[in-house]
């Protein structure tokens, strides 16, 4: 049982690292798919909060 939880934790950690190192469009698509269930106002808030982080490398 502990081995199964250990492998699940490792796979989740690798998936998290993969999502960190993915290009910004994939991350934006993932955030929009997560916030699509909520209202449009919260989606706009998420985009306003996330977009400056993707603009900073271009400076």
Curated annotation (Swiss-Prot):
TM annotation in the entry: none
Compartments where found: Secreted
Keyword Secreted applies: yes
Tissues where this protein is expressed: Expressed by the venom gland.
Keywords assigned: Secreted, Signal
Signal peptide boundaries: 1-29
An annotated GO cellular component: extracellular region
Protein origin, superkingdom: Eukaryota
Family listed: Belongs to the non-disulfide-bridged peptide (NDBP) superfamily.
Name of the protein in question: Venom protein 27.7
């Amino acid at each position: 049982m502990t081995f199964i939880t250990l492998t699940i934790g490792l796979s989740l950690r690798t998936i998290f690292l993969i999502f960190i190192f993915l290009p910004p469009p994939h991350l934006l698509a993932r955030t929009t798919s997560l916030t699509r269930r909520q209202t449009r106002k919260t989606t706009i808030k998420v985009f306003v909060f996330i977009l400056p982080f993707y603009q900073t490398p271009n400076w």
